[in-house]
Amino acid sequence: MSVVSKNSYILFLFLLVLFFASCKSKKNLHKQNPVASVDTTVEKCHMEFKTGKALSKRMYDNELDFTYASAKFSCELTIDGDEKSFNVSVRCRKDSVIWLSISKLGIDAARVLITKDTVKFTLGLTEKKYFTGDFSYINQMLHADLDYDMLQALLFGNSSAFYDDDSKLKPGRDRNTCQYFLSTIRKNQLKRINSGQEPAGESYQTINLDPVTFKIIALDFTDIHAKRKFSASYTDFKSVDKYLAPFKLLYNITAEKNIKADIEYSKININEQQSFPFKIPASYERIQFKK
């Protein structure tokens, strides 16, 4: 990187946490993590979904749906033991634009504007810098496969299509917690991989669903070739209009750097029209990243 401040690097790592959580994989998937509370009506963990497509549909039917959304959250970001805390305001027009205002100690530190085609941000305070590019540029930088839909889904606890054909996904259910999960490998193979009895492929991941609400409660992704691991958990679900949304999100990345993001929403509102103010002052200096 050149002409890059520490704050701009941290902002990119923060976006990396958000993006990497939804990484697409056309390979295999991984195991379950947190324990969800199980309704007393779910007794024997009966597997009533015979196909991944059927279970995926139930998951999609219970996702947060909106035209506009706005939210506020606090974030504790830890990078190799170095902690940073900040607050974020989010505005979104579904499938169109995401706007982020990042502040520290009540002072506007950064603005981010993301569309299907562009990624822009400005750094305020003493930085007075800006970046403008697109997903192909960021994908090349981060060696990832990112897009707008992934970030939008992640911010609101929804799914992002991680496999081209839902009919090829394998459904499963944990006998202890009754959690459902979706994987591209079968349950017995997943157990052998987790126990070390069978080597994993190039990558594998899992989506875990609450057995009552069918909301996503955990994600796991391991990229063997790149030596990267990602895990996410979603808790503290609250009503947002007629939907449920997680108000606490925890992300962990193990790669060249160990990154943890602990996010807690204070509010989420939907279907109130939003504006997306974004301006690059003429005096700001453009940030240049080496490819």
Q: Where would I find each of the regions flagged by the language model?
A:
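Gly/Pro-enriched, hydrophobic low-complexity segments
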Residues: K24-Q32, K168-I287
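Bacterial N-terminal signal peptides that target proteins for export
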Residues: M1-L11
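C-terminal motif of bacterial Sec signal peptides marking the signal peptidase cleavage site
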Residues: F19-S22
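C-terminal low-complexity, charged extensions that often adopt amphipathic alpha-helices
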Residues: M141-G172
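N-terminal leader/targeting segments and the immediate start of mature chains
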Residues: K24-D82, Q288-K291
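Solvent-exposed loop/turn segments connecting transmembrane beta-strands
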Residues: I79-E83, I102-R111, I224-K229, T254-N258
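An acidic-aromatic
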Residues: V97-M150
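Edge/loop elements at the starts and ends of beta-strands within beta-rich repeat scaffolds
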Residues: D61-A69, I79-K84, R91, V112, ...
